[in-house]
Regions:
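An N-terminal hydrophobic leader/cap segment in hydrolases
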Residues: 1-25, 30-37
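Active-site glycine-rich loops that stabilize anionic/oxyanionic intermediates
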Residues: 43, 49-54
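The serine-hydrolase catalytic nucleophile loop
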Residues: 52-64
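Conserved alpha/beta-hydrolase
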Residues: 63-89
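Alpha/beta-hydrolase active-site loop
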Residues: 94-114
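Alpha/beta-hydrolase fold nucleophile elbow
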Residues: 117-128
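Alpha/beta-hydrolase-fold enzymes
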Residues: 129-160
Length: 160
């Protein structure tokens, strides 16, 4: 399957590992940006699930380190973040109607990873909000991931 190329801001990213960025579409039509870093003989793939207001380039250095350790890396800009599609009413605002919409992003990401034959084992690293999204993905599609690691995960929000 062919995917349209998506932008990558070298000036914002630390790390020079070989990468490619593409546009994918969630089943509700939301356009999402994904990037993957690859190397010749991968041990598997690490999925990076970033936190709120973060963007793919922020993880360039981590991606480079993981590639140097033998892993391919796949990252996504969640809907409303980075270059992924934002709500029409305020394109500068990251917004979802329901937190469960992020699972549509996960579904599209997994479909993409399978379509480009990213090698297993598949490992997830979830930071902050990405940890919450990742934990829910494990409940829904846990058989897709072999391992998960969480960094300062957002397990919930306390009000008041």
């Amino acid at each position: 399957m062919h995917y349209a190329d998506a932008p990558y801001r070298h000036d914002l990213a630390d790390g020079s590992a070989e990468w490619s960025c593409h546009w994918i579409t969630a089943d509700d039509g939301t356009k999402l940006r994904v990037c993957n870093w690859t190397q010749a003989t991968p041990r598997g793939t690490v999925f990076v699930f970033q936190g709120r207001t973060e963007y793919i380039e922020k993880y360039g250095r981590i991606a480079q380190m993981l590639v140097q350790c033998g892993w391919n890396v796949l990252a996504i800009d969640w809907r409303g973040q980075g270059y992924s599609e934002r709500p029409e009413h305020d394109p500068m605002q990251g917004y979802v109607e329901h937190f469960a919409q992020y699972q549509k992003d996960i579904d599209a990401l997994i479909d993409y990873a399978k379509s480009i034959d990213l090698p297993k084992p598949w490992n997830m690293v979830g930071h902050s909000m990405g940890g919450c999204i990742g934990l829910r993905a494990l409940h829904r599609r846990g058989n897709e991931f072999d391992h998960a690691t969480f960094s300062a995960p957002m397990w919930g929000i306390e009000f008041g």
